[in-house]
Amino acid sequence: MRFRYRAGRQITFPANPINTFRGALGYQLVRIACIQRKTGATGCSGCPVFEKCAYSQCYETGPGHIGQGEGMANEDVPHLMVIDGGFAGMQTLTEGSLFDFTVQLYGRAAESSPYIIVAARNAGMSGLTSQRVPCDLEEVIDDSTAKTVWSAHTDEIQLPRGNSLDLSEPGLLPHDSGEMKLRFVTPVAFKDKASGSITLEPEFSRIIGSLLRRYSAFEASDGRQLNWNFAALTRIARQVRIANLKLEPIYWERFSTRQQQRVPIAGVIGQATYIGPVNMFQNLIQAGEIIRCGRSTTFGQGKISVISTTRLSERESSDVFIDS
């Protein structure tokens, strides 16, 4: 859903406008969705409706939202919401300017659409950025159909029809060699499983691993379990090598209300060329253009696009793996 606002007066967004909108949206979503506000309890821990709450589904996604047990930490569960900004940060918009934010909801979080729309309207009325600039929500548009979901003129919600993303398991044989070029549109970063630290190295296996986790989690949140051979797919993905990198590191900070401190976030943008058994992963990678990959996707990171995919001839593919 694309949320179109009109600035009530001159407004200047910080480096990452998405973080500003996400914070304002979350604040208003708590106000309309949280039942614990009436009991004096703080946080989502122990809430009896945690798994059904619109706020927790989008902001505090946990194992229960994807049908998993308590062995998985919340930070390892892919968020069911991703936000995009339709403009760059660190710029001043004049009074009356139109600007957009896009919210994508995955799995069971799609049920939260009405709450998100009301919260987005309230966020604009309360004011955006630290200057609390009032911004009127003009309309909400379904990007997939270009139809109006809500407008200030009618003040009626016409819920968008959910789009399904049905993928078949990548075929394990044969392992045709190919070349794939990817663009990292917004900063991409990954969590290294061995060390637990954040890495900016866009290894192909890390991209595939992230996409497998995200897609399986979104499917599970809708009650569908994937019976794919994840171990075999991961082993094949590790055979893919980086042929060329043109990357630029991006560093920024966000203020964490929960931690009451600024939290650094990093990632890389640019292009990467991969060579090896990439063709079998083409559908999964293309799905990644929708579901994102890596860390901090809820803050707009992890947006990728496929530049090209080429099947290599036998001679070309054999030369790739010969040490010079």
Residue ranges of predicted features:
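RNA-interacting cores
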Residues: 1-324
